[in-house]
UniProtKB/Swiss-Prot annotation:
Additional remarks: This protein may be expected to contain an N-terminal transit peptide but none has been predicted.
Species of provenance: Ostreococcus tauri
Family: Belongs to the TRAFAC class translation factor GTPase superfamily. Classic translation factor GTPase family. LepA subfamily.
Main location: mitochondrion
The EC number(s) this enzyme carries: 3.6.5.-
Chain coiled-coil ranges: none
GO BP annotations, alphabetical order: positive regulation of translation; translation
Reactions catalysed, as given in the entry: GTP + H2O = GDP + phosphate + H(+)
Keywords: GTP-binding, Hydrolase, Membrane, Mitochondrion, Mitochondrion inner membrane, Nucleotide-binding, Protein biosynthesis
Annotated protein name in UniProt: Translation factor GUF1 homolog, mitochondrial
Amino acid sequence: MRRVLKELCRNATALSASSNASTTALSQRFRSTLSFFRYHSSVPLKNADDAPTADRLTAVPLERTRNFSIIAHVDHGKSTLADRLLELTGAIRRASGGARNEQVLDTLPVERRRGITVKAQAVSILHRDESDGEEYLLNLIDTPGHADFSFEVARSLSACDGAVLLVDATQGVEAQTIATFYLALDRNLVIIPAANKVDMSSADVERVANQMVRVFGVERDEVLEVSGKTGLNAEKVLSAVVQRVPPPRGNPDGSLRALLLDCRYDDFRGAVNLVQVVDGVLHKGDKITSLASGQHFEVLELGFNTPTPIATNVLSAGQVGYMITNVRDVRSSKVGDTLHMRGLTTIEPLAGFRPAKPMVFQGLFPVNSDDFEKLRAAVSKLTLNDASVTAQAENSSALGAGFRCGFLGLLHADVFHQRLQEEFGAEIIATAPTVPYRIKHQSDDTYIDCTSPLSVPSGGFPSKSTEIEEPLVEATIICPSNVVGTILELCADRRGEQLEQSFLDDSRVILRYKLPLGEVAADFADELKSRSSGYATFDYEEAGMRKSDIVRMDVLVNGVIVDALATLVHRTKAQRHGKDIVARLKDALPRQLYEIAIQASLGSKIIAREDIRAFRKQVTSKCYGGDITRKKKLLEKQKEGKRRMRRIGNVDIPNDTFAGILSTKRD
């Protein structure tokens, strides 16, 4: 550590510029992952009173409290607008020298690296409104925009009474814009429409505003014209929140009821909970009880996120803040739980929100089997912070002990993998993704959930009385009118059924399709972007189950099934998928002294095969002339030896080979 610090001081000049090359060089030198967070130098606030304090935050009554969220399609500027609102209210200092605060609420390294919001973040800010001169407490929740993190959006909206619906003025209404609008509408939230990025030369404010009027049914004069980059009309957003969004519907004098919104693990303090007090008052030192588990807690610390944590002794009805208890066990916190005072037995549970339903399953295994306990601890702590992930223990003959994890999509899974590596140092192998199928036995009309290919017999069920149903989704695709033909071809190739086609405006079309989830989860989004040159967007929701000809395809190496490579595919696509995976495995496996046969099979039927030729050893090199029978005898002896090696030898597939094959997208 001393050597590391010494080297950091020596390279301070390079690191002050956040040089990626310098950081990479130091990481390689010390064989460690180094992360640097850059803070802009700041200028003082206009008034010392602008900085929020615990006394000022707790003094705001319920009727002057507003809980709202910013929702939009990915990359439409939610986090950027949130930064300007925080600067405007004095929650963060304005950066000096022309620099701007960026992604203040995106605290995870993976969020800053990818430039997307993964976790919804809540922050309490104070705003003095010009209409009445009163100070208001605004609890702002910045939400993700990608469809894979819709659970974070739904969870955030359950704590809100209004939402700022943001639309990029250069892009217009997108598929996820419509999805988040209906999420907010289902919760009876007040919608504040706003067109963002109006400062850009390519912005078409009137066209986008008319789209919002037509799609969302809002009035044209309700649409705010803002710029998250420059802060244009940011104060109008705050005024609209104060004037249009109602205060929380809670009873400050009632019995305590608090909703557990989120939780994260801290190495020093244990579980740090994000709570919203709905009724009553929560004090530091209170003895509270979980309605779901019946477990008792003592409140050790309370506070507001401003976004800097500010400790307080009390949280009142309508307020959102963090809570630390005397229980460090990560399994004691269940997101969506209702908390109440200990000893009360007639507490009505809060509505909370629906648990997330995993859409994609993957097996996660440690690269080194000795690191399983390390992986177990990492998964346990990370699922506390991301309640939409499910994890069950699983064993594989090829990869050893691991977990079968459920995610909301492939991006969600990829972010989870990155967080395991960056936050806990866990090196993992992820198996091929599969969707949750359902096995139906007609003899007794029972259903069995199937999240692993090994749950299905090789080649399918022998009895016709047993069926497999696959999940369906109803997809909404918004694309330019000139690429509709190629998008229709893509949906047809993915076994889609067209439901509707309509025009959003003169240049863009809305397509609605019913598609198998397995076809969407693989690489549908990437292929959609490729065929539309990046202009098409899509979102989907569950649409039930349907009987389908789904079969298990196995991969055999020298006649031995490799369970980690088993997949569930539609019978019509099994051969194409089989040829693809055996070809990739042939390129990845090292050659041996004997021939290796790589096969893909449906039960006993081989549908694809590749062979890796053996190394040739020149056994006749020591023969200089003489009788030809001597050479033949040596060649026959070599041939017999190779037959014996093929019979008794096992092909050891390295773990990095698994990782390379399973991470490669299909052709």
